[in-house]
């Protein structure tokens, strides 16, 4: 797979000293010309109104001329024309040229006044006039992007959303809400609500404002009752309490946060994640998995209470999706729990959209120890009832120092073993790793998914091969 396109050159960089004197005075004019040209880009819905304005102005001018020449203003119109005639010069500047100059000045004045009115209105709404065309162009372009539903939770999902929002605004994140530890667990127990932590991360990832994203993720380091909580978690808890539930508060949340896309909990009912192990034991509560699973392994996970309902908005998004992405994230605690909602699982099974599983880079200590990629896919198939159409796996090498750091915590690189040849035709390799980490690069991952959406790749890769 080809790497994502290089970023555009920094046009704000200073020009060479040799021509700086010539370039500097023209910069404002060049920037204005570029902005003016952008208003004429296809898809903005502006050119039709410019055309209508020109036509109406011409018709209005002709009608006004007819009115003044045939109506009670005829004497005044005659004096006006005679006054203009004094500026004419036969053979050099004829009468019709005088009229054209006056008409051009009048049109320029009208356009200037409309521009200033628009700028004043934009400033009143908090939008910088200089960036209005860029914002409009970006939103129009993103509104035509892929309709994608992402399923999961944790850092993996928020990373994915960070990359996807640069390609589309038609994003629906379906977030697992079974966490029972940390700030989420405390709020869940105190207010009988779903865990808000992963929802907060997704809202921050889709936020158009970096300042708002930082605010949502701010974690209080002191204060009785506040220490350990993030502002975003408290905001979601407040809206859930005020509106009588998180489900009814979702529209308010989206309007307040102005995110690029939609974020929904997999269910609005507080649920507990239960793991059934190979040795017959049962563990209740996600926060206990890592410590209590070993030396056994997970056979199946389920929710208590069973058969929680899903939001209507989630089911509609799945039905309308052009791609459904599972992960990246923890297999048994982030991805599969959302697929245990019967309505969501049924909608995904019946959807004509391709289902893409973004494989983790490392195993989860105590959760997926010793599992290969084919084991991951089999677990998804077993719980969902549908095998992913695509499996996206990174072929970038994790730096040895990073691997050693993870190995000290009990994590190893996820591999595609011999049994993985059963996945032939489904696996797609791409360089997805963020340099110096064992995490997916948001932009590389989004670019790989967009390539899958644009059309099936010409060939697939198996271990040992490279794109």
Curated annotation (Swiss-Prot):
Cellular component terms (Gene Ontology): cytoplasm
Record key words, sorted: Cytoplasm
GO biological process annotation, one example: regulation of cell shape
Span list, region Disordered: 1-27
A GO MF term: LPPG:FO 2-phospho-L-lactate transferase activity
Compartments where found: Cytoplasm
Pro residues bias: start-end ranges: 1-12
Main location: cytoplasm
Record has Nucleotidyltransferase as a keyword: no
SUPFAM superfamilies in the record: CofD-like
One Pfam entry name: CofD
Family to which the UniProt record says this protein belongs: Belongs to the gluconeogenesis factor family.
Protein name stated in the entry: Putative gluconeogenesis factor
The organism of origin for this protein: Deinococcus radiodurans (strain ATCC 13939 / DSM 20539 / JCM 16871 / CCUG 27074 / LMG 4051 / NBRC 15346 / NCIMB 9279 / VKM B-1422 / R1)
Organism lineage: Bacteria, Thermotogati, Deinococcota, Deinococci, Deinococcales
